[in-house]
Amino acid sequence: MTERELLKDKKRIVIKIGSSSLTHAETGDLNLAKIEKLVRIISDMRGMGKEVILVSSGAIATGRQTLGGKKPETVAEKQAYAAVGQARLMMVYQKLFSEYNQTAAQILITKATILDDTSRTNAKNTFNELLKLG
C-alpha cells in the first residue's frame, strides 16, 4: 500500500517540514517555490475535507538569513534569530495560504506545554477549535 493510499481514508493529517525543506541549501534563503507547492497541496487536501496540521521548523534558519548572521551558538542568538524568522515565516504562510482562500494560524508549543496538564488541555482545545473553524 502506498503512502497516498494510507492517507486516503484519514480525516486528520499532520505534516512536519524541516528547515532544510524550506530553504535553499546554498544560500539559506526561503525556497518560496517549494513552500508554495506545499501550501497548494495542503489547500487541496483541505478542499477534500481533510484536517491538516502543518508543523513547521525554519524560524532560526529564516532569521539567520534575514539578519545575515553566522550559525547561532548561544541560546540568546537562537532566540533572536527565531524571533525574526518566525514573523517572516508566518508572513509567507499567511500570504500563500490567502491565495487559496485559506487562513494560517500559529500555535507555539514547548515541552513545558506538553508536560503541564492545563497548558496541554488549552493547546488541545485551541487545535480543535481552529480545526472546527476551518
Feature roles, as predicted:
Residues 1-134:
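Nucleotide/pyrophosphate-binding catalytic subdomain
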